[in-house]
Regions:
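Re-entrant/interfacial helical elements at transmembrane boundaries that shape
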Residues: 127-136, 301-318
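Hydrophobic, aromatic-rich membrane-embedded alpha-helical segments
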Residues: 109-136
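Transmembrane alpha-helix termini and helix-breaking/packing motifs in multi-pass membrane transporters
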Residues: 164-181
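Membrane-embedded alpha-helical segments of transport systems
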Residues: 117-122, 144-169, 332-344
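Membrane-interface alpha-helices at helix entry/exit sites of multi-pass transporters
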Residues: 105-107, 127, 140-151, 322-332
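Transmembrane alpha-helix interface/packing and boundary motifs in multi-pass membrane proteins
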Residues: 80, 114-123, 289-309
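C-terminal transmembrane helix pair
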Residues: 300, 310-369
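Predominantly cytoplasmic-facing regulatory/coupling regions of multi-pass membrane proteins
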Residues: 3-113, 178-295, 340-369
Length: 369
């Protein structure tokens, strides 16, 4: 009788675990479908208003970018992208040092590159996978490395904001057109005007007060305790900035990453002779504007699919370029970057798997001897 009960309990536990995993996978699948649907919507949106002649010219422009000397500039674009990933890896090494975790630069690079590969498939999976790799191969606790990842994201937002401001100062007449014509600012103001604004503020205050009053009771839940541990890991990652042993190098790496993003686009523009000949020296400022606005495309759609080329085309239209040229530039640069992350990410997976297997074999042989 006892054996039957134990068997039933085991079956229930197994069923609960199975349902939990299915729920997680279902959420990931739904999230992926939503982001892909947005991406394909932007693809349709970018091509919908083009005439058959424009679509034909778009394909010709994209194909010509890989002919002649164009492929050299596109390869250089990919190499600069790889450099930006290496810089991210080096920056993460510096951030982990104050916590007494000395990660190899090669492993830091591979973890970041594999993270980019994962993000092509599922949003935000890359950050989790990156920390998991460091935990498995470099014995860095997940919370600690994830805290530094959050810190990196905060820094990236700050630097992106500075670049955004710089771009608007240099090209205010053109870039403000995107927001003015689409009434973005007006819509935001209207949403937070009148009674709605006060309801939102009152709701936030009420939530904060309730959390403070019932804080001791709330902290008794295991899930809250886990969240607390994660947040403590985040905090340690955040304060690691001021404790870094190489502050100058840290700042240089952070700025250099965004310099790489700029030159990835700028160099790739030389694969499009019509763009360079039309804009001349203005291609430098146009590249800055495209990098700033194009970054938004990676936020709204999976891997920037559809959204990135559309935004690049919108920016280049402000410089007098037709949609058949702007979309070709956006799609080619997006394709080159995505292909680079795909190939180098797969290569990094192979390298760390081979390295881990070799290390494990050597360890077993040493124990046997």
């Amino acid at each position: 009788m006892t054996a039957c009960k134990n068997e039933n309990v085991s079956k229930k536990c197994y069923l609960c675990i199975l349902l939990s995993r299915m729920k997680k996978y279902l959420k990931d699948i739904v999230k992926l479908i939503i982001f892909l649907a947005l991406g394909f919507f932007f693809v349709w949106l970018s091509l919908n208003d083009l005439t058959p002649e424009d679509r034909s010219q778009l394909w010709i422009n994209a194909r010509n970018a890989f002919s002649g000397n164009g492929w050299i500039f596109l390869v250089l674009c990919a190499l600069i992208g790889i450099l930006s990933v290496w810089l991210r890896g080096r920056r993460s090494v510096i951030m982990l040092e104050p916590m007494n975790y000395h990660v190899k630069s090669t492993m830091a690079y591979h973890s970041v590159m594999i993270g980019y590969l994962a993000n092509l498939a599922i949003p935000r999976l890359g950050e989790i996978l990156r920390c998991t790799i460091l935990q498995k191969y470099e014995h860095v606790p997940f919370q600690k490395s994830f805290g530094t990842v959050v810190t990196e994201r905060v820094l990236d937002v700050l630097i992106c904001g500075l670049v955004f401001v710089a771009a608007f100062i240099l090209e205010s007449d053109r870039l403000t057109t995107i927001f003015v014509e689409n009434h973005v600012a007006d819509n935001i103001v209207n949403m937070l005007s009148g009674v709605t604004k006060y309801i939102v503020i009152a709701g936030l205050i009420l939530i904060i007060v309730l959390i403070y009053i019932f804080r001791k009771w709330i902290l008794q839940f295991k899930i809250v305790q886990k969240i607390k541990q994660v947040l403590l890991g985040f905090w340690e990652g955040l304060i690691s900035i001021k404790n870094t042993k190489h502050p100058v190098r840290f700042i240089v790496y952070s700025l250099s990453i965004w310099v790489c993003y700029y030159f990835m686009f700028f160099v790739a523009t030389f694969a499009f002779p019509e763009l360079v000949s039309t804009l001349g020296v203005r291609v430098a400022l146009a590249s800055l504007s495209c990098v700033v606005i194009g970054t938004l495309g990676f936020i709204v759609a999976q891997g920037g699919l559809g959204a990135y080329p559309l935004l690049v085309s919108m920016v280049l239209a402000l410089y007098g370029m037709g949609a058949e040229v702007g979309l070709a530039v956006g799609w080619v640069i997006w394709a080159v970057e995505s292909a680079m992350y795909l190939m180098m990410g797969l290569l990094s997976l192979v390298v760390i798997s081979f390295t881990h297997e070799t290390t494990r074999t050597e360890t077993v042989e040493n124990h046997q001897n």
